[in-house]
């Protein structure tokens, strides 16, 4: 007998091995119809057809469960393959993973796919779903899978199988009628679960992500548990399109990118004002938190990067240059340079913690196809800081950083913060005791701050665990920004030492920390978060003064000078245009305040105040308006 325990504590007994679907049927036909997969003993997910061969705790997964989304999306990727092979038999399927909010499938085809092809593929998927067919899984011997894909000419599937170790002797093959694909699963048992999907776009990709390899075509899509969720997501996409930082950046004359410098940003005066405002804000954070700001070279001999480990683990993403028979690397990260500053002199344990901060310009050789406006670039500047401390000081330093980070995010208008701890991976440096201490220190720091967090087992770097800060923006998208990372490796590799209380030389712990991360990416996120409607303290132009007629010319100049003297960013519009035209133009430019001056304002020494949201605040004295502006300044 096999006993299956359900989440409510009830038990069902079966005479022998039983599938998830059979258990669902035993409970009731309604549950069976809704069953997508199962979770065994609170751990891994299995297909509805998989047999349970021992006593187990079973949770049946339905579309109501969060886990169902990934299964639905992965199954939709296979459905893309089914549709593509019916429409374009010569195409060769590569991989089709799940990504945030959706999925994609990479395909090799000599024939470039067009938007019309995308629509045809989507329509064929709808037709296949309407057939309401079962998705059938067979565990198949490796040699039979090889034979199957050879017969079908699926060269990329064969290459993927070649990459698998010899221990893989069998694999799951999922049958969508005549179409087959391999996967660990689980997948939906029937196409009726795939109705709420949409194909969104086509882009280019490279086999194994290497530009030296053949180019593939990537079909992106999204899938949800029901039509309502799909419609809500598509609405969010429309909202995101309106907030696209590239469009707003062009409309507000903030920055541009061009072909001669892929992934490198040209900042225009207005955009640079925003940059400098954020930089000055972060500089104040450095100063108030005991950081010494420094500046390190842009290029360093490769010998340093070999010592740091970047050469072995990161050289494919680095830029190099040669001079006088020496090879230099353009820095992709700032940390090795900060260690060099620390090493200039021997430190006592009494000196620790030592905190360094830098607006460090870095360059990384990102694939051209991955570049995306300000959000993915090759040249970027980080608010990069490093703390050299003892193991006993980790908790206090992390606690201080956490409080500092939350205040920064609040000042920029982010209140919904998710916190995650990435824990030790299987392959790692350092002993288990050091990892125990580091992970315990991160947990203790967050506990002291009375916040909740999610733990991510196995997702820490090989040199230490880290805390990640994920921020939700105005339309519900999540962005990973800040991190604080414990590093046991680099101080030792680069010879960083201090003298402890027993006069012994020891390597300090190094904490890598950033609050906003890449300044370019952060500004891109802010543009989309605010939809270009900047808070007054960040706005490149905070106030525009507009006269009604030439009779107010001199008075408008006086107001302009008075506000400039107070340190505000002010423009003046004295053009011979109708005041309505001026108001519309500056409102569209999202200038926070427009001050209109006519004869009445000139006579009374006031200004008529309007906001970019078209709110009329009436007449104010200049001093009253200055006071209002000052209350809105963060820096």
Curated annotation (Swiss-Prot):
Its cofactor is Zn(2+). GO terms for molecular function: ATP binding; metal ion binding; threonine-tRNA ligase activity; tRNA binding. Disulfide bonds: none annotated. It is found in: Cytoplasm. Zn(2+) binds at residues 335, 386, 512. Its main location: cytoplasm. InterPro entries: aa-tRNA-synt_IIb, aa-tRNA-synth_II, aa-tRNA-synth_II/BPL/LPL, Anticodon-bd, Anticodon-bd_dom_sf, Beta-grasp_dom_sf, TGS, TGS-like. Residues 1-62 form the TGS domain. One of its GO terms (cellular component) is cytosol. Signal peptide: none annotated. HAMAP family: Thr_tRNA_synth (MF_00184). Homodimer. Belongs to the class-II aminoacyl-tRNA synthetase family. This is Threonine--tRNA ligase. It comes from Xylella fastidiosa (strain M12).
